[in-house]
Amino acid sequence: MNVTKGGLVLFSANSNASCVELAKRIAERLGVELGKVQVYQEPNRETRVQIQESVRGKDVFIIQTVSKDVNTTIMELLIMVYACRTSCAKTISGVIPYFPYSKQCKMRKRGSIVSKLLASMMCKAGLTHFITMDLHQKEIQGFFNIPVDNLRASPFLLQYIQEEIPDYRNAVIVAKSPSSAKRAQSFAERLRLGLAVIHGEAQDAESDMVDGRHSPPVVKNIGAAMHPSLEIPLMFPKEKPPITVVGDVGGRIAIIVDDIIDDVDSFVAAADTLKERGAYKIFVMATHGLLSSEAPRLIEESTIDEVVVTNTIPHEIQKLQCPKIKTVDISMILSEAIRRIHNGESMSYLFRNIGVDD
């Protein structure tokens, strides 16, 4: 692949070695060298960025993956963007495969919509274009006042299923909760496979979070001002039904699909349930493998046979701890997106056959 126009500068942030490795793969596909930038922390833990080449009038692309120190990662990105802005870059595009704080995209209790705050900070710093993959909620695109390209990793995961699971025709796609049923349905329809949904105690805690602010109860009667007929009815509390699997998984390979694997307890519980229902092999596939805390150990000790994630987030240490974790490289689609944006070409090819629910 060759970039036909000059004036492209590709920078890698310094959050971790995997970020640099991903940036090198993208640069190699584009036929360019990584830009020279120095990112480091002062003894007082402040982040300092020094752009070591001219970016005046050029299209700058900054690649940043999310490390365990997510807040430092964000500050690195913001300072790099602002440094390029003050150095008179023509455009500044952020390539952030996993958008941090994406789970905090809804109002919960007396909290805040942190995704909206972070999007505003990126735009304020000087970002003119945002490239990411599989946002946790598509509505996050509306938090930005700049163009957003939400690329999809599902073609790479579908290809992995076809090439690495020899008897995938005997598989069934599984949603571990009703909230992930649309994604599972998309996989099932594209692979011409059956669909199963787990409902009950294995549901995500996120989908069941109470949105009450825990204010004191309303006083029913204040003198004669409130009539008994005006009492406001309250929502009944939820009760999860006994765990059930809607769909036949007996004697089949079960492929659980989701967008993020973080705390794996729900995936382990889903795998145990599927084994009890007769599935003889369990795969878990997701775009973003955060794999926090004890995830590698829990996966290794579970009935899950293989966990497949992309390299949107570094997880080399987790792979050493758990051989069941496999990685799919998505640098190809990121490099093609960069090439098209830089050359002013249409991005529609990268979204071909992608529906509203994908």
Curated annotation (Swiss-Prot):
Domain of life: Eukaryota
GO MF, one example: magnesium ion binding
Gene3D superfamilies associated with the record: 3.40.50.2020
Pfam families documented for this protein: Pribosyl_synth, Pribosyltran_N
One of the GO biological process terms: nucleotide biosynthetic process
InterPro entries, A to Z: Pribosyltran_N, PRTase-like, Rib-P_diPkinase
Keywords in alphabetical order: Nucleotide biosynthesis
Function: Seems to play a negative regulatory role in 5-phosphoribose 1-diphosphate synthesis.
Family, as annotated: Belongs to the ribose-phosphate pyrophosphokinase family.
Protein name per Swiss-Prot or TrEMBL: Phosphoribosyl pyrophosphate synthase-associated protein 2
Source organism: Xenopus tropicalis
